[in-house]
Regions:
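Walker A/P-loop nucleotide-binding motif
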Residues: 85-105
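Short glycine-rich substrate-engagement loop in P-loop NTPases that contacts/grips substrate
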Residues: 117-148
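Conserved AAA+/SF3 P-loop NTPase catalytic/coupling segment centered on the Walker-B
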Residues: 147-174, 183-192, 197-207, 221-227
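N-terminal accessory segments that target, anchor, or regulate ATP-driven/P-loop NTPase machines
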Residues: 1-16, 101, 225, 275, ...
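Post-Walker A helix-loop "phosphate-sensing" segment adjacent to the P-loop in P-loop NTPases
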Residues: 111-120, 176
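Extended, charged/polar low-complexity intrinsically disordered regions
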Residues: 1-84, 196, 293-336
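Conserved AAA+ ATPase small/helical "lid" subdomain
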Residues: 1-19, 228-309
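Conserved nucleotide-binding/hydrolysis micro-motifs of P-loop NTPases
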Residues: 98-100, 127-130, 159-161, 191, ...
Length: 366
């Protein structure tokens, strides 16, 4: 064995090392934000946050299992893109709650796959009134193929109307769809179907167990799922806590990403109270609701790098103020609105600052 061969690090060791860095990043944020009592002094989680951006940029996660699931899908798409003999669509199914950032994830996925000429086209199937409504996204797909791009066609809420299942079957099988007098031939593309219905999971389980569908009307769904040839991807709920898994850590990273996106990546420190409130609160629509909270933060002075607790001005001073605000549609508590106000008041007792970006560090935010 040569010296060079001895010095090589095996892929397994590299993965193990990366997994350890993810674990350390999670622990760092957990100690800083998730502990019951606030830290005694200002904390720096900038490196842990940067680790959450390492796979998909603005789609942040420190959840190792979720990262591995995403990576598996990325590799599936790469292999498909590089294989000129595969001309049928690559079909992927995504399971996620409403408001979980599905379209944002697909857009970040397309940016990650730019070396493979990927580009995203998004369409919400809940808005589909007739098959003619599919003309716009499919024409966008055709336009991308003209310039040699690999379209990622994202069809959100595909399960909102089971009557649409039959419409999707020819599209998923050979990339072809008849719309009025037009025969749209799409050929090679990636189709990502996203749904949130529990019947999807039930039908997938029964199909994998080679059992009959739970209900006779699920036959078309089984037929559709039989065309899934690119794998499955689940976006776990943000309040999932099970064993070593704590998705609340991703709520911290997500809040930072949303703040940096809004303020052009200039922020270096933010209040601990805001991150603690997000971690401990229940949001009705997941990512969408946290984004709404971030949008309610008052504008900062131009080129401001530090966000103070007094800068926030959130509608959380009292129950009447909360009830009269748009935030009332997004945050909830089993103990009622008074518990939300009490949580915010408790969080605001600490004026600890959290460093989220090193001084002078430059970064691209989308």
């Amino acid at each position: 064995m040569t010296i060079e061969e001895k010095g090589k690090i095996s892929p397994r060791k590299k993965i193990k090392g990366l997994e350890e860095r993810y674990k350390e990043a999670r622990q760092h944020i957990a100690v800083a934000i998730l502990k019951e009592s606030p830290p005694a002094e200002d904390v720096d989680i900038s490196e842990a946050y940067q680790q959450s951006r390492s796979l998909l940029g603005d789609y942040v996660t420190l959840d190792w299992q979720h990262r591995q699931d995403i990576l598996r899908i990325i590799n599936q798409i790469k292999r498909y893109a590089d294989d000129d003999t595969r001309r049928r669509p690559l079909n992927i199914i995504m399971q996620a709650e409403p408001g979980s950032g599905k379209s944002h994830m697909v857009n970040c996925l397309a940016r990650k796959l730019e070396p493979h000429h990927a580009a995203a086209v998004n369409f919400n199937m809940a808005s589909l009134q007739s098959i003619d409504d599919l003309s716009q996204p499919l024409d966008a797909v055709r336009n991308l193929k003209v310039v040699d791009r690999l379209p990622l066609l994202f069809l959100d809420e595909f399960d909102s109307n089971p009557a649409n299942f039959a419409t999707l079957l020819p599209l998923m099988w050979d990339g072809e769809l008849q719309i009025s007098h037009r025969d749209l031939m799409l050929g090679k593309l990636v189709i990502i179907l996203a749904g949130s219905g529990k019947n999807i999971e039930q039908v997938m389980k029964s199909a994998k167990a080679m059992q009959t569908p739970p209900e006779a009307q699920e036959t078309k769904l089984v037929d559709l799922l039989s065309r899934i040839n690119g794998g499955e991807l689940e976006i776990p709920a943000l309040d999932t806590v099970a064993g070593d898994r704590d998705r609340r850590i991703d709520k911290v990273c997500l809040t930072i990403a949303l703040l940096q996106s809004r303020f052009a990546g200039k922020l270096e420190t933010i209040p601990w109270a805001l991150l603690r409130f997000v971690v401990m609160s229940k949001f009705r629509y997941g990512v969408r609701s946290i984004a709404h909270l971030v949008d309610l933060v008052s504008p900062l002075q131009e080129n401001a790098k530090a966000m103070q607790l007094s800068d926030l001005n959130l509608p959380l001073l009292s129950v009447p103020v909360l009830r009269d605000s748009s935030l009332a549609y997004h945050v909830f508590s089993e103990d009622g609105p008074a518990a939300i106000i009490e949580l915010w008041t408790e969080c605001c007792k600490s004026e600890i600052a959290v460093r989220i970006r090193k001084q002078g560090e430059e970064e691209e935010y989308f």
